[in-house]
Amino acid sequence: MIKQKLNVISRFKLAHFSGTLTYRNCQLANIKMKHYKNIFVGIFFVLLFVIATLATWVYSQIDSALPQLEGKKTLFGLSATATVERDEAGIVTIKAKNRLDVAVATGFVHAQERFFQMDLLRRNSAGELASLFGEAAIDYDSDIRRHRFRERATTIVKQLPKADSDILKAYTRGVNQGLKYLKAPPFEYLLLQHEPVEWQEEDTILSVLSMYIDLQYQDGKRERTLGLLQSTLSAEVYDFLNPKGSRWDAAIDGSQYPASPLPKAPWPSASSEELTTLMQGNTVQTALNTLIPDILSREKSPQSEEFPGSNNWAVGGNISATGSAIVANDMHLGIRVPNTWFRASFEYQSKHQKPVKITGATLPGTPNIIIGSNGHIAWGFTNSYGDWSDVIVLETNADNSQYLTPEGYQPFLKRKQMIAVKGQEAVDITVTDTIWGPVIGKNAQGDLLAYRWVAHDTTAVNMAITELETATNVEQAFAIAARAGMPAQNLMVGDNQGNIGWTIMGPIPQRSKAFGEVPTSWANGEHQWQGLLPAADYPKVMNPDDSRLWTANSRVIGDDMLAKVGNGGYALGARSLQIKQNLNAKNSFDEQALLDIALDDKAKFLLRWQEFLLSKVLTTEMLAKNSDWQEVKTIISTDDLAATKDSVAYRLVRNFRLNVRDQVFDIFNENMTKLDEDFSFHAIRHQLEIPLWQLVNQQPENFLWRGHDSWTALFEETLEKTLAEMTEKSSLANATWGKQNISKIQHPLSRAVPLIGRWLDMPEVELAGDSYMPRVQGKSFGASERMVVSPGHEERGIFHMPTSQSGHPWSPYYGVGHESWVNGEASSFLPGPVAYTLTLLSY
């Protein structure tokens, strides 16, 4: 009994001890949990504090990168006080004592608003993008470095006339002070973790050289492509694919050239032995499987119809509402955020102490008004597409160490180049030069090729365009154009006396004889450049009888004048012809009438393709075979074919044409690419409309590729493909042109970091317009501005452009004006009421 009690007591004590131990363990666990919780809470708040601090710092840095809009700043280089006025859209009016002070103030404003854009321009032509973006840009930089543009820019700066040099120095002072006075570097450098580098005088030259790269071939691509065709195809097939003229030509001198006739021989027998050998022993499909990737994928989409250029036109005072000339201009470029141009007005005293007031568009990186009006003249540009370069076939010795010149064999000049690369060691490359220019590669026969290009000359860039600001008539503008250093453009100019004129503005090479379409040897001295064309010999047209002038990147003149300019790859003349027809449709014009021409989206070019579909494809037999196609016929049976946002018919006819083109030429394109990877279908695609139309109408069976039984089968397959593409995401009735042509206007950094796109990019909207009509408009390509102005009547003028003045997303006018551009509204050419005033004081 006693023993049992002791056992009970023992078990009780043990249980009590165990309970106490468990309780204490629980207490310890709770203490530990509270301790860990406190640690976690502490860490959370520390992280929150760090994130908040970092966010505050980032916010502060971005906010501090905004330009100063009001107040006072003291600038070195000003001779007197200057003011910078901005309206609500950020359009700048600079008022200063003289042109040099305007240059200082312009540099200051450009740096504060657009320095990152300026930086990209100079790095683009210098081949220095890899130091900003890393290894992704090494290949591009290596390609560009062969031009040695930074060295050339430095040389140009040293030999500029004093007046040009003074403006360049003043602008550079303004840029660096504008950058310095930002409280933080432009926000892009924060994202790139890079410090901006100060502006140098040669950087302005590099900015213009970047426009050469944009507007001319930096690699001779088109000439090399034509050279391959000429060496590979029979003469009649080559002429067929490279016609001199077409029904679309609308030259201002009325000159016309016929298209080449359809060759008698089909593709295979018309081709050289080399091309025939390519296909021997292979079925078509085997050949396709072994071909290298299509060059198109490395250039543009095969169906890209973008054509860097522009429209401009003018009417004389005798048919204008103002009595002065009226000039219209829209320059077609790739569009991104911010826009290429920066709007400004300058007010100052000329060197003759006369008041100057000029309004227009500037290019950040340069101190000039590029297009605009000064009360006496108004002017605009389109890309000329003359022949401003030559590819030279080098005759080398056995080991390719020397090349033949008129003076005998000479050694190649090798130059080392170092490419700085962000985040890794620099890359060393070697560029090879000749007396004519850099070596750019080899042709299909293995010959080395050199490149002679006006952009390599010391005359390529100068500040002569500044003189347009004080020109008072068309003749003075012509004289300035002939000595200007810039990518050669079609200058359209009108004055307040009602005169209008066209000429080339920029350097024109003077060749020893007619040549330049295809690569040629210069070894015997027969082919050479003999300096630049004298000013007196520049082609020009002034005051035509009908008081109307127009250009749109196609051939402008013929005969002797054309021989001076050459053909560097003209656009098909459809846009030019439509502008001409619109000008001839009226007897008098005001500014709105000319803007209406700029906004014309009628698809006159595609009318014959519309009729072709209706009469040759959607036949009774074809409709019986494909009953669903009755809807197609109903849709495209419209009397008003236009690239409007709601048009299904336009999208269908347009895409059918492009798919037919690609079906007809695809094997040909692939064969040429196999022979030479530098072959560029993209460079010749516009001229192929002429032979394409002959082929689809004459339908020679021996010109069919890819195993089609007949042309009818090709058209049927192409229409099926077109409809399948259009109905992939919607019914055919809802597959409008606007659904395909949706804007994609982005900041360069948002492409790399999509998350910031909503913050930086313009809204995606459906757009009217397309190629082959005045209203040129693609997803991220089109009219970089539209201007209509009559000199002396600027208050009636019209100007709008995509994106906005600002490059900073927190700017009060970021995106302001973009909607006017989308809708084609007649917004004012002149700045509006002053909203912000900044006073710049001199030391």
Which positions does each model-derived feature cover?
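N-terminal Sec-pathway targeting helices
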Residues: 32-49
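Substrate-recognition/specificity elements adjacent to catalytic centers across diverse enzyme folds
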Residues: 42, 55-326, 331, 337, ...
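Second-shell loop/turn segments in exported
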Residues: 102-105, 152-165, 462-468, 563-569, ...
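Glycine- and hydrophobic-rich flexible loops that cap the catalytic core of alpha/beta enzyme folds
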Residues: 348-361, 368, 372-377, 381-523
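Hydrophobic alpha-helical segments
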Residues: 484-586, 656, 660-664
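Terminal end segments
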Residues: 564-622, 715-843
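Charged, long alpha-helical assembly modules
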Residues: 656-734
